[in-house]
């Protein structure tokens, strides 16, 4: 989010040079810089002990490609707690091990996605209402089912390269 007006007092912002950051939106009335903001979210490749990854169909996200478990961090929640919660909520799996992979800027959605690999013991899926279907796919086959170049694709490719 890029501020044009101060969210505290409503004054139209000016720009002020701040150190190495360059020109930053600034409220002369409140004497505060207003940095651009973004939503922080997680994306995780859920991998079982057989080397399979859970790929989801969420028609509100894409009707043509599979996706990975993803979600927005709640206020006061760590990224790791968000991964554990989202994996349980969306597909009913219990995370046994977490590994941070990489952060992914997503400018189109004004988002920063924190990418993880979540290891689980394979069990039956229990889907939330926002998941249309899910299936286990061999990790090496997963990129072919994801949108090439997309964040889920990049995450899975990085995990494969590190294996």
Model features per residue range: what roles?
Residues 1-61, 72-124, 163:
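N-terminal leader/linker segments that precede catalytic domains of diphosphate-processing enzymes
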